């Protein structure tokens, strides 16, 4: 079928599948990052399609901070069991030994040690030369200027001023020993594209994306869900049952919920058509300091 005969979502799907297949053929030891969110779920679905009826020929890696929502971990394990993909889970052992907590140590230190350093540990441990990520250019300004094939040096750092040209969808995956490429097959998708594709393909998601009554407290202008008994409450502070959902998912102490009645995919898509705010406004790690996401990416974050 000619490209002009494909629908918008079909064109995005075809581009992403081409990228996934090209990486699988070009690199010796690729891995797909699996953060359990909606973008990861779409990327997993595309990988399954890319190699159907065979199995995905590379593992999925979850860098677990030990502070994810309980529903996310349960969903992760259910997906691995249902689809039979190889799942690698890595936790930063030094961070666990130090007892790193977003409450005691703050979002910046927690993210650096448990996410960035944990990711670099896992990539070094398994010797991966390419790693798929679910980032999209419409999410955030530093991601908007990143290539589909994002070169990382032997320290896993990113230099936005030294990126490779990608003319006519031609990608340069040449790396020396110790270097790697971060690959973003969803680069050209928007948040609305993601939701419409989830609806079209009937992709399973963590229930946290759908509105229901949940126990939350207000912190720094954000509604934080009390997911377990590790969350310290201020004197007199009591969680309230509010009808909320999550537009983006991460560590529960650093992820804000939003008031919503969208408990179906159709209602979420309708909500997305009307929204004028960024999905990442609910992520505390993006507001640590000016240009905080670009700084994290320079240091090795996805």
Swiss-Prot record:
Intrachain disulfide bonds: none
Keywords (A to Z) from UniProt: ATP-binding, Nucleotide-binding, Nucleotidyltransferase, Transferase
EC number, as in UniProt: 2.7.7.4
Reactions the enzyme catalyzes: sulfate + ATP + H(+) = adenosine 5'-phosphosulfate + diphosphate
Gene Ontology terms, MF aspect: ATP binding; sulfate adenylyltransferase (ATP) activity
Pathway(s) of this molecule: Sulfur metabolism; hydrogen sulfide biosynthesis; sulfite from sulfate: step 1/3
InterPro entries in the record: PAPS_reduct_dom, Rossmann-like_a/b/a_fold, SO4_adenylTrfase_ssu, Sulfate_adenylyltrnsfr_sub2
GO biological process: hydrogen sulfide biosynthetic process; sulfate assimilation
Binding partners and assembly: Heterodimer composed of CysD, the smaller subunit, and CysN.
HAMAP family (alphabetical): Sulf_adenylyltr_sub2
Known function: With CysN forms the ATP sulfurylase (ATPS) that catalyzes the adenylation of sulfate producing adenosine 5'-phosphosulfate (APS) and diphosphate, the first enzymatic step in sulfur assimilation pathway. APS synthesis involves the formation of a high-energy phosphoric-sulfuric acid anhydride bond driven by GTP hydrolysis by CysN coupled to ATP hydrolysis by CysD.
Family to which this protein belongs: Belongs to the PAPS reductase family. CysD subfamily.
Protein's name in the database: Sulfate adenylyltransferase subunit 2
Higher taxonomy: Bacteria, Pseudomonadati, Pseudomonadota, Gammaproteobacteria, Alteromonadales
